Swiss-Prot record:
This is LIM domain-containing protein C4F6.12. SMART domains: LIM. Keywords: LIM domain, Metal-binding, Phosphoprotein, Repeat, Zinc. GO terms for molecular function: F-bar domain binding; metal ion binding; Rho GDP-dissociation inhibitor activity; transcription coregulator activity.
Amino acid sequence: MHSPIPELPRFERRLTGPRAAPSSPVSTNGSPLNNLVRSRLSDGALNFTGGRIATPLPQPSLKTPESPLSKRNPTIKQNRVRFDLPDDELSRSNVSSPEKTLLTSASTSTFDSLKKELLPELPSLAYSDDDEFPSSPEELNSHVNYPDVRNVYDCHTGLQPLVDHDCIEDRQKTFASKQLPTLPLQKSSKLSNRRPALHSFHSAPANSLYPLPTPTSQLPSNLSSNNLFQSDSLKPSMVSSHTSTKPVLYRGNSEKSCHSCGGSLRAGRIISASGKKLHPQCFKCDTCSQNLEHVGFYYREGKFYCHLDYHEQFSPRCKHCKTPIEDQAVHINNDWFHENHHFCAGCSEVFNVNIPCIYRDDLYWCQTCYDNKYAVKCKKCRKPILGISVKGSDGEYHSQCWTCGACNALLGDEGYFMIENTPICRPCKAISVKFNLD
């Protein structure tokens, strides 16, 4: 029988630990009397192994670090004692039970066996310090060990994963120029219990390019739409660089190019005029380079003009004032007039629809002015003869002006006599002869 360890007060248990040896009462100043504890430890009377007295162990080192003051009594300084166990005791305390060790070893072996069956070793590169780094893809493939894909099982279904051998072989042939490591696969005829094959463009390498769908109507004559996509072929077709050419911008050729300079219209403001699109700075007169953004303009033969330059170059000119006609015009005998400049050269009366005009000597005349200027004048009244005239020996007369100089009778067709440049009828001539009136 071992003598029980006397129960310590709560205050002393806190000082020395739950399994510490009984100590002497605390002094009045708050520090424990450690001499008794040190003497017992030196004699080997106490050993702490689960609260029982055992064979003496090597003397532990006693450390009494200073602790802060207690919150209950700040004046009393509390010290805690910590015992450092030797290394052999620590090793003995960590030894587990035989049952636990046996269970651990059994579970470890089971996990290792399942790991080897379910997760085969991945291909790895093993080089020593003396080996040299492979300089070619063929030398690299000689150092790589790849597992057989048929030995890998699906952990969820217990079935082997499906591998499309035809697809992989075609892909290897296509990218043979890249010298990629290939998998040593073999064709298998037992596919009854496997999943159906899914042909998808996503199974191809990420750097492969496939042609975009092309409508049948746009295909060349030597190609057909059936040759574009095949469900059992995943061979990528690389787009050649010479197929896409940069478009050449001509002046006014494209809606996205400026009509004047041919530059791009993708950014900034765009002006649309007469079905043409231009930069704001390019929308100017072709003659004087005036900006036409906020003024009137004219479009002719692919060029833009301001108001003045267009009329100066293309509008007809008035025959009277020699200036371009901008508004309504009068066109007669290949001549152009302003509406108010077509008037009589004699009286300046403007011609209209009701007033006829007569053209002579490169001028336009009204009837009155024309008669006054160009008509034959009567020898007697000096007025123009517009109708029937009588032609005398000294000139033409109106029919009513053709009379006898003595009696003013109409001469008619009876004949006459000229006396002193005056026509005299027959009766008047007879009287003059009778009475010697000469």
